[in-house]
Amino acid sequence: PKTASPAKVSATKGYGANVVLEGSTYDESWAHAQKIASETNATIIHAFDDSHVIAGQGVIGLEIIEQLPNVDEIYVPIGGGGLVAGIITAVKEKNPHVKIIGVESSAYPAMKKSLENNTLETVRGDTTIADGISVKTPGKLTFDIVKQKIDKIVTVDDSDIINAMFLLMERSKAVVEPAGAVALAYILKHKPE
């Protein structure tokens, strides 16, 4: 999207990519990317609603289970749902008792709304610091997986995300993008069950 962070754009260009900034949301950018792919006969891979992408992200769940075999809960950021779909599939296969809690930005609660209504929903969306998870409509494939396996979806506000980012900088000397801080943001504001 046109709102992509300069750091992400620069890093992507650094890999040799031709970056086209179009649309104000992921959904608008995806539509434009599909148009370019069609016009240029290019291969296009969806960022989250693709079985291979979901499987690849599932490896994170396997690593969590390997490193923390007694884990009770895992909090996962949700935008379009690919990350949570992959993690939940892998983790629930290994240990169905682990609770998976998805965390969305309160500005883009698309998966939460979709689950509440048992159908894919498109949210209007609002300004958020968490651009990496600002998705108006979850993926169909990801929605189908998440609705069968998720334990709960919660939301966090930008102020909570910023607090989590600052804590990570101060205590861990880690600089994370806002989408990567949403799980900690929720945990800091609400004690895990």
Segments from the language model and where they lie:
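PLP-dependent amino-acid enzyme catalytic core
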Residues: 1-193
